[in-house]
UniProtKB/Swiss-Prot annotation:
<feature type="topological domain" description="Cytoplasmic">
    <location>
        <begin position="579"/>
        <end position="592"/>
    </location>
</feature>
<keyword id="KW-0966">Cell projection</keyword>
<feature type="modified residue" description="Phosphothreonine">
    <location>
        <position position="57"/>
    </location>
</feature>
<dbReference type="GO" id="GO:0006821">
    <property type="term" value="P:chloride transport"/>
</dbReference>
<comment type="similarity">
    <text>Belongs to the SLC12A transporter family. K/Cl co-transporter subfamily.</text>
</comment>
<keyword id="KW-0406">Ion transport</keyword>
<dbReference type="GO" id="GO:0035264">
    <property type="term" value="P:multicellular organism growth"/>
</dbReference>
<dbReference type="GO" id="GO:0015379">
    <property type="term" value="F:potassium:chloride symporter activity"/>
</dbReference>
<dbReference type="GO" id="GO:0008519">
    <property type="term" value="F:ammonium channel activity"/>
</dbReference>
<feature type="modified residue" description="Phosphoserine">
    <location>
        <position position="1044"/>
    </location>
</feature>
<dbReference type="GO" id="GO:0046872">
    <property type="term" value="F:metal ion binding"/>
</dbReference>
<dbReference type="Pfam" id="PF00324">
    <property type="entry name" value="AA_permease"/>
</dbReference>
<dbReference type="InterPro" id="IPR018491">
    <property type="entry name" value="SLC12_C"/>
</dbReference>
<feature type="region of interest" description="Scissor helix">
    <location>
        <begin position="667"/>
        <end position="681"/>
    </location>
</feature>
<dbReference type="GO" id="GO:0043198">
    <property type="term" value="C:dendritic shaft"/>
</dbReference>
<feature type="topological domain" description="Extracellular">
    <location>
        <begin position="204"/>
        <end position="229"/>
    </location>
</feature>
<dbReference type="GO" id="GO:0032590">
    <property type="term" value="C:dendrite membrane"/>
</dbReference>
Length: 1138
């Protein structure tokens, strides 16, 4: 026999019209206020959050209370995903020290000026700045000389090696730069955040010194062009003879260099905006000069320029002192001597005493620029290294030599070599011409999409400049005479710039263009170096440099600029471009070496945060680039390399040992213990940065009577998460006393260790003996780990048989575990249906890992699938992310924002936004809630007397009715129709359950009398009706699940409370509604998924609802094979920053 109740409810529109809208409004805290520990390390608080930099703190603070009621108690700490994603639209990433950012920081009291979003693309933001920084003074002043000395073959190898070094470095830099957002600091930021403050500080200071000496080199190049090619008469110091020209030139360089440095520093101090305004002008000069060179090469093939050079025998003559390349000239019928005669003879008379070599050899005039079609390339293939003071000679020309040991008069108008040259020296001089590849990363804050622009723009710029350099080497050797190439200052071609003689339409194009380009490069160096020093100083890793972190009110680094100018003056006092170039080569090579090292280390360690969007990198390429940089350092100058490494080492040790303690043990074991102690003490200094966060797992397993693990799949899953490279502690609890159960604990440890070894889980095992299970688990959670090496995540299985346990202690222990992990700010992973999880030998050839991101609680849901997909079991599973849109959410914009967020996180996944519109609470939800509350009352009655049970039932009834009136005054009215056959058999069926059948067309019972509050007949005709049916089948099924300790008398007292829907706690109804609706959506989308991850709601704050909480979770995960409930620890575990 069944007992039927008919319940009629008003339409939803009627109830919604009179409902108080505030009753369903709940505030969501700003996602930036997520509770988390203070983060130390880099002084940038933005990096602790995933990406949020929104100024709209109110948007998205409301949520649909009925659809998401299951998560309502956590909305103050875990915001809805829609409100989190809305921050993407207002995300800005400003470089440190930028003018607008500093003004905004300094004017907090007033109205802040809105900052424009980054607008620069790949071409303007990365490609052109890199071209400007790479092309420089060496191309115009020294490349022709390098080709003449080393020959085409060796010069080609030199350029290829240097360009390969920068290309490999650019690949490594692209991987680092795309591993998150680089707010400011360029290479210093990337290295320091990848290798730590010690390496970052050491290499950052080396890079600063390199940039500063680069400024000195550019200034010296500017003075050389000014005094040698533009205005030679401006020289203050003049040589009395040829031997004193070098010393006079050095003094002129020092004086004019100091003046130019002062002017440039003043311009930078007054306002960097003027430097930026003229940057494109300087870049235009560089590009125009290079185009003029190529135009000249093309023209020389059919119309070579007229630049004759004069040879005495095979010796090259300087054209400064004479005009006619001949010993004698004919004026009418008379033979007269030329000015050249007077330079080699005692007088202009024909019978004068002349130099012996001048007397024995003839004077020959040849073209200095024969052109590309002359076949000159064969003669310039091989090297012609010179020693200092040697005359530049042309191979293949007849020459009558002198006796060995005959001194050469330095006052004769020969072209002399000013320095001893060799291959390694040329490498050191040439290498600065390929530096400047960091220009794109230094401007990352101004780019529209830095993760796309930096790799593309930098690599394209290096490819372009490499092509220009390599082609220039070949074209210079094919078009220009060898003795002209080896003439560093163009003395043989009337003092013209050698590369200018090849240019079209005029050499002045190259001279003026190179002058302005070197001026611009010097200004850029004096602008960038102080900001780099300011970034290092503000990090606070080098205490004595902190004073240089301050500046003017607008953020300009005044003190850093002053120090930069002083160091730059040191380079100018050296006064030789060829001496300064190897110095800055050392510092740049060291910086590039550590960029490659950082990429190689990150790749080999495979830390969870290492997810570069740039995919075309490999640790072997980074290692090759690092080796090449180290080799070039010693090739250029082994003593400069040692000095640079010593400086970096001293800075490293200073930063490392500033307040640190060092201790050495005895032997290998003592060293290991000392290193472990040292590392643990350093970990104790503070919580890890978000970028260094990794899951440190505490895996709670249960052992049977034979001390074997009940669910070994938990350890299989732990092994599959090993990509996190974190700590693993496998813990278990034995009930009893330590004295009696110590042997069993040892056997359990051995059993767990064997299983860990079989599952390839590297970690520790800990078995605790406690008087009860709850205290033992609590002890493991509190005391697991050592010092800073502690767990931050707890992995546990779902209590599968929590309903059937006689003492019902399992689910109570589970809820206490959830509460303790929350209190300890630990993440919690709960595996449901753990027996269905795959073992390590299994492989999924297809399928998906579905993430249901309901609320944001630190990003754990994003990180876990990424780690799992590194394991071969899950490698072929794709990742899908679902999030839920509410009534007021723009689902299209949410999908776009979520896609952008994943792009910044460097995570590849399919994105889908599921719309959950407001809907009526279904009859099935009421049924589930009613059954749940009945079970709850049964559980509570186990320890109550009859009078206590009656009072408890009455208090719950009153509380439920009061809740209905307070929270939902327009709740749909309920009408109860009881048939005549009311003979019930409650005592005989103590565990009867209620089944609801939703029927839109069934008529109400005519024999029932209307209730006092019944609506008129007209309204009742359209009301939906719901039938409650008490069925025996469910009663039998429920009874067969397990024995119940409840007495029949207690059940009779319990059923004295009528199971009316109006008695239901409306909070439970709404929570059940959330669980049912979410479950329907999840099952619909993810029924065939290999694994489903979703947010785990927190336990109720009122402990009276603990048993209901278990039912909510059970309903939420019904009909799903493999489920992992994830609950964050209250801090960010994933970030978009590098």
């Amino acid at each position: 026999m069944s007992r039927r109740f008919t319940v009629t409810s008003l339409p939803p529109a009627a109830s919604a019209a009179s409902a108080d809208p505030e009753s369903r409004r709940h505030s969501v805290a700003d996602p930036r206020r997520l509770p988390r520990e203070d983060v130390k390390g880099d002084g940038n608080p933005k990096e602790s959050s995933p990406f949020i930099n929104s100024t709209d703190t109110e948007k998205g603070r409301e949520y649909d209370g009925r659809n998401m009621a299951l998560f309502e108690e956590e909305m103050d700490t875990s915001p809805m995903v829609s409100s989190l994603l809305s921050g993407l639209a207002n995300y800005t990433n400003l470089p440190q020290g930028s003018r607008e950012h500093e003004e905004a920081e300094n004017n907090e009291g007033g109205k802040k000026k809105p900052v424009q979003a980054p607008r620069m693309g790949t071409f303007m933001g990365v490609y052109l700045p890199c071209l400007q920084n790479i092309f420089g003074v060496i191309l115009f002043l020294r490349l022709t000389w390098v080709v003449g000395i080393a020959g085409i073959m060796e010069s080609f190898c030199m350029v290829f090696i240097c360009c390969s070094c920068t290309m490999l470095t650019a690949i490594s830099m692209s991987a680092i730069a795309t591993n998150g957002v680089v707010p400011a600091g360029g290479s210093y930021y990337m290295i320091s955040r990848s290798l730590g403050p010690e390496f970052g500080g050491a290499v950052g200071l080396c890079f600063y010194l390199g940039t500063t000496f680069a400024g000195a080199m550019y200034i010296l190049g500017t003075i050389e062009i000014l005094l040698a090619y533009l205005f030679p008469a401006m020289a203050i110091f003049k040589a009395e003879d040829a031997s004193g020209e070098a010393a006079a030139m050095l003094n002129n360089m020092r004086v004019y260099g100091t003046c130019v440095l002062t002017c440039m520093a003043t311009v930078v101090f007054v306002g960097v905006k003027y430097v930026n305004k003229f940057a494109l002008v300087f870049l235009g000069c560089v590009i125009l000069s290079i185009l003029a060179i190529y135009a000249g090469v093309i023209k020389s093939a059919f119309d070579p320029p007229n630049f004759p050079i004069c040879l005495l025998g095979n010796r090259t003559l300087s054209r400064h002192g004479f005009d006619v390349c001949a010993k004698l000239a004919w004026e009418g019928n008379e033979t007269v001597t030329t000015r050249l005669w007077g330079l080699f003879c005692s007088s202009r008379l024909l019978n004068a005493t002349c130099d012996e070599y001048f007397t024995r050899n003839n004077v020959t005039e040849i073209q200095g620029i024969p052109g590309a079609a002359s076949g000159l390339i064969k003669e310039n293939l091989w090297s012609s290294y010179l020693t200092k003071g040697v005359i530049v000679e042309r191979r293949g020309m007849p020459s009558v030599g002198l006796a060995d040991g005959t001194p050469v008069d330095m006052d004769h108008p020969y072209v002399f070599s000013d320095m001893t040259s060799y291959f390694t020296l040329l490498v050191g001089i040439y290498f600065p011409s390929v530096t400047g590849i960091m220009a794109g990363s230094n401007r990352s804050g101004d780019l529209r999409d830095a993760q796309k622009s930096i790799p593309t723009g930098t690599i394209l710029a290096i490819a372009t400049t490499s092509a220009v350099y390599i082609s220039s080497v070949v074209l210079f050797g094919a078009c220009i005479e060898g003795v002209v190439l080896r003439d560093k200052f163009g003395e043989a071609v009337n003092g013209n710039l050698v590369v200018g003689t090849l240019a079209w339409p005029s050499p002045w194009v190259i001279v003026i263009g190179s002058f302005f380009s070197t001026c611009g490069a010097g200004l850029q160096s004096l602008t960038g170096a102080p900001r780099l020093l300011q970034a290092i100083s503000r990090d606070g890793i080098v205490p004595f440099l902190q004073v240089f972190g301050h500046g003017k009110a607008n953020g300009e680094p005044t003190w850093a600029l002053l120090l930069t100018a002083c160091i730059c003056e040191i380079g100018i006092l050296i006064a030789s471009l060829d001496e300064v170039a190897p110095i800055l080569s050392m510092f740049f090579l060291m910086c590039y070496m550590f960029v490659n090292l950082a990429c190689a280390v990150q790749t080999l360690l495979r830390t969870p945060n290492w997810r570069p969007r740039f995919r075309y990198y490999h640790w072997t390429l980074s290692f090759l680039g690092m080796s090449l940089c180290l080799a070039l350092m010693f090739i250029c100058s082994w003593y400069y390399a040692l000095v640079a490494m010593l400086i970096a080492g001293l800075i490293y040790k200073y930063i490392e040992y500033r307040g640190a303690e060092k201790e050495w043990g005895d032997g290998i074991r003592g060293l290991s213990l000392s290193a472990a102690r040292y590392a643990l003490l350093r970990l104790e200094e503070g919580p890890p940065h978000t970028k260094n966060w990794r899951p440190q797992l505490l895996v709670l397993v249960r052992v049977d009577q034979d001390q074997n693990v009940v669910h070994p799949q938990l350890l299989s899953l732990t092994s599959q998460l090993k990509a996190g490279k974190g700590l693993t502690i496998v813990g278990s609890v034995l009930e009893g006393t330590f004295l009696d159960n110590h042997p069993q604990a040892q056997r359990a440890e051995e059993s767990i260790r064997r299983l860990m070894e079989a599952e390839k889980v590297k970690g520790f095992c800990q078995v605790v003996i406690s008087s009860n299970l709850r205290d033992g688990v609590s002890h493991l959670i509190q005391s697991g780990g050592l010092g800073g090496l502690q767990h931050n995540t707890v992995l546990v299985g779902w209590p599968r048989n929590w309903r059937q346990k006689e003492d019902h202690q399992t689910w109570r222990n589970f809820i206490e575990l959830v509460r303790e992990t929350t209190a300890g700010h630990l993440a919690l992973l709960v595996t449901k249906n753990v027996s269905m999880f795959p073992g390590n030998p299994e492989r999924f050839s297809e399928g998906s890992i579905d993430v249901w991101w309901i609320v944001h609680d630190g990003g754990m849901l994003m990180l876990l699938p990424f780690l799992l997909r590194h394991h071969k079991v899950w490698r072929k599973c794709k990742m899908r992310i679902f999030t839920v849109a509410q009534m007021d959410d723009n689902s299209i914009q949410m999908k776009k924002d979520l896609t952008t967020f994943l792009y910044h996180l460097r995570i590849t996944a399919e994105v889908e936004v599921v719309e959950m519109h407001e809907s009526d609470i279904s009859a099935y939800t009421y049924e589930k809630t009613l059954v749940m509350e009945q079970r709850s009352q049964i559980l509570k009655q186990m320890h109550l007397t009859k009078n206590e049970r009656e009072r408890e039932i009455q208090s719950i009834t009153d509380e439920s009715r009061g809740s209905i009136r307070r929270k939902n005054p327009a709740n749909p009215r309920l009408r109860l129709n009881v048939p005549e056959e009311t003979a019930c058999d409650n005592e005989e069926k103590p565990e009867e359950e209620v089944q609801l059948i939703h029927d839109q067309s069934a008529p109400s019972c005519p024999s029932s009398s209307p209730s006092p509050g019944e609506e008129p007949e007209g309204e009742r005709e359209t009301d939906p009706e719901v039938h409650l049916t008490w069925t025996k089948d469910k009663s039998v099924a429920e009874k067969n699940k397990g024995p119940s300790p409840v007495s029949s008398e207690g059940i009779k007292d319990f059923f004295s409370m009528k199971p009316e829907w109006e008695n239901l706690n409306q909070s439970n109804v709404r929570r059940m509604h959330t669980a049912v609706r979410l479950n329907e959506v999840i099952v619909n989308k993810s029924r065939d998924a290999k694994l489903v991850l979703l947010n785990m709601p927190g336990p109720p704050r009122n402990r009276n609802g603990d048993e209901n909480y278990m039912e909510f979770l059970e309903v939420l995960t019904e009909q799903l094979d493999r489920v992992m409930l994830v609950r964050g620890g209250g801090r960010e575990v994933i970030t978009i920053y590098s």
